[in-house]
Each structure stands twice: as C-alpha cells, then as structure tokens.
C-alpha cells in the first residue's frame, strides 16, 4: 500500500491556500486589514505612462565645485599674503599665476588642505589644478547615485506607485512612471535643482551698471519675478549665508492676505545661523534664491528666533506646493536634462494586456489538449499542476509587488511550456519503466527519481540566465527576468510536488490497472 507523505499534503495545501489569498486582490477588492490587498503592478507598456531618459549635467557640477575651490583659494591667499593673478576656472581646471616661485611650498600646503586629491601641475610661475581620472569617476558615480536617490524621493512624494528608476550608461538615468496622466508636472519637478540659498542684497551696487556687466567682484546679478512689476534684476552678495540643506520642514500655506506662500523650518544648526544672520543684519534685505532665481528679498526687521520663516512671492497654490515638495526632499547635486521622452497611452497598454491574455489562453489550451491526448488521466494531473503553477506565479508577483511588463507576460507563457516539459520528461521515464514490466507504483517512483536530477539541472541553468538578465538588464529585460524566475520556481514546485501527489492519490484510492502510458 502506497503511503502518502503527510508533509507533501500539508505543504501543498498551505501553499495553495496562501496563493489564493495573495492572488485574490487581482480579481476582487478586499478591505480586510489582516489579508493582503495588493494586486500585481502593471508596467509602463501595460498600464501606460511616461518614459524619461535623464542626463546628469556633471560638467556643471564639476565647474561649480572648481568655482567654490577657487573662491576658497582667493580667501586663503589673501589671509597668507600670497601674491597671485589671473585665477580662473577653465575647462574644469583652475589656472593661476604666482608672482614669485618662492611661495609654491606654502601654496601647495593651502591647496592640499582644501582638497588633498587635487593634482597640482607647475610650469615656472603658472599653476594648473585638476582632478585625476579616478577621482573624476568617483565624483561622477557619487553625483549619479545622489541624483537617483533625490529623483526617487521626489517621485515618491507625488504618490506615484512603483516607478522604475535605474542608471543607464555612464551618466544617464532611466525613469519609467506607469499610470502618469500629467507628464508635464513630472518634468517640472525633475527639471529643477531646488538649490535654496540665502544672500544679503548688495545695496551699494548700481543696477543699470550691473546689467551692462559692471558687477562688483563679490556680488552677482540675478533675476526676479514680481506680480506687479514683472521681471526685474537685483544685485546680491555671492557669499551664501545659509543653504536649504538645513531645512527640516516645508509646506504650502497662505499669508494674511490669503496669498499662497511656503513656510519652512530649520534644524538646530540652521536655526542658530538664521538667528545670527537676522541679528547682525537688521535693516538690510535678505535675498532668498532658488536655482539662481530670486524668490523674494524681504527687509530684516530684527532677530528671528526659532528657526521658522516664510517665502512669499508670485506663487499659485500649485507652485507653492511644488516648491514645498522640492525643499522637503532636498536639492539635486546638479541639474538634470531630459534628453528623451516617450509617453504610452492607457489604450495601448490595454491592447497589450488583451494580446497577452489571448496568447496565454491559446498556449494554455493547446498545452492542456496535448497533455490529455498524449497521457490521458495523468496528463490531466499535469494540467491541474499547471493551473496551480499559474496561481503561484500570480500570488508571488502580487506578494512581492513586482512590476509585470509585456516581456514579463512572455516569460510567464514560456514557463507554461517549461512546466509541462518537466511533466513530459517524468512521464516518459515512467513509460520506460512500464515497458520493463514493473508495477505501477515502482514505475512512478523510479520515473520521478530518475527525472528529478535532469529537471533540476535544466531549470537551474535557466535560473542562472534569468539572474544575469536581471543584474545586467534594464527596464523590460528586468521584468522578463523576474517573471521567468518566479515562473521557473513555481513550475518546478508544481511538477515535482503537486503532480506526484495527485498521481499518488489516484493510484492509492482508485487503483488503476494501467496508467495509460503504454
């Protein structure tokens, strides 16, 4: 008498019930808190949405870094009374001339104190400062990783579900956001660096002369926008008194005149700096600048204690909310340029889903008919195992919130054939044993045992390929790899455990004289 392994029965029941619970939200809405309620996430090609390829402007980042170093050098040279001239930033290098080569030793010490990784090239009294290639690569990787993280936080703050965000090539970022109805808003929040800085207004500068290009060395000309006066210019000090890196909160609100504004709060350090700035500069104007554009320049009437402030300007409710979002998340290390944009409509996604359903249904039906015609009753068991494998796949995709793409559907359809292939291999081995004249029980046990190693080997090699596709692939390729991996694991379980259990139950309780394989 064939004894049914209890662990197989328990495992099969638990897995099947759990799979039904996880897959159920794809068909009906469940509001019970103790049950899973997430359905499968549909990718861009199935749901529609926006596909953006972003270019990280590393040259701007490098140039800004060199400008900051150059400003620090000027300050240090004045403090140490080192004579120099023609200190300029060109082609991401710093160039200068010293009046005497005797100061080179002191100069090198100052430079390495600012940044020990700067390479110093000396040609008589001319000096060139630059970064090595390895240092540039490290900086590029850092900037790209920071940009990806900031973009992810900005997208997540909009409530968008399951954005696909990954590095592509050297300095490109691929962003796919399914289900986006307003790509222009998406581009708007990505197109801003959101670098917030506070400067004193240069009250002594002549605006007309500054517009002509005659600007004091320690000042700069920036543009503002007023609801009443339109565009205008103002001269501010270059020195950044405080930056947005110290912000902890930012939210859209309304002022006493019911006009939109942005309220913000600083952390402890930022609050102390803000208090000192307002205390020491009473009667002066403080310029609030975002991405080199003036937001406002209010008069400082006295020390502001507590670290809270407001930004007023020509805001709408939408622009105030947008600015608050950008300030909360933080600034990008460098601007991002959209170099490629594609939008996929929801109708096209619906057509893709319908095509995938038809292909899957045709493939499933053909496989089921083939198995029944070829193997009779145990072919039916293979079909039942196949249905359960599809259930497990759907459950795992829902449980792990994996994104299903059109290539992912292709991967699932492919695993349907692979699942049946394992059963075919097992059944052919059983048939070989039956031809030797052995009993049904012995043929079944030997057939499964002899086919087991072959099934594991073939599926393992496919899994290795799927892992490689996931690691090195992008976008749809990753979706295919995920679906293929989940499909292989599910099909192996159904072929080895479920099919064997169904055949054992049939043989034990129905005691067929023949298995229908001869």
UniProtKB/Swiss-Prot annotation:
Task: Enumerate the GO terms in the molecular function aspect.
Answer: protein-transporting ATPase activity
Q: Which family does it belong to?
A: Belongs to the SecD/SecF family. SecD subfamily.
| Sorted UniProt keywords | Cell inner membrane, Cell membrane, Membrane, Protein transport, Translocation, Transmembrane, Transmembrane helix, Transport
Q: What is the lineage of its organism?
A: Bacteria, Pseudomonadati, Pseudomonadota, Alphaproteobacteria, Rickettsiales
**Record-linked Gene3D superfamilies:** 3.30.1360.200, 3.30.70.3400, Multidrug efflux transporter AcrB transmembrane domain (1.20.1640.10)
User: Which species is this record about?
Assistant: Rickettsia typhi (strain ATCC VR-144 / Wilmington)
Protein name as catalogued = Protein translocase subunit SecD
Q: Is Transcription among this UniProt entry's keywords?
A: no
Give the transmembrane region(s). Answer: 9-29, 356-376, 377-397, 406-426, 451-473, 486-506
SUPFAM superfamilies, sorted: Multidrug efflux transporter AcrB transmembrane domain
Short name of one Pfam family = SecD_SecF_C
Classification via NCBIfam families: 2A0604s01, secD
Q: Gene encoding it? A: secD
Any one Gene Ontology cellular component term annotated for this protein: plasma membrane
Write down the membrane topology. Multi-pass membrane protein
Task: State the compartments where it is located.
Answer: Cell inner membrane
* Chief location: membrane
- One GO BP annotation of this record: protein targeting
Organism's domain of life?
Bacteria
Under the subunit heading, UniProt states: Forms a complex with SecF. Part of the essential Sec protein translocation apparatus which comprises SecA, SecYEG and auxiliary proteins SecDF-YajC and YidC.
User: What's this protein's function?
Assistant: Part of the Sec protein translocase complex. Interacts with the SecYEG preprotein conducting channel. SecDF uses the proton motive force (PMF) to complete protein translocation after the ATP-dependent function of SecA.
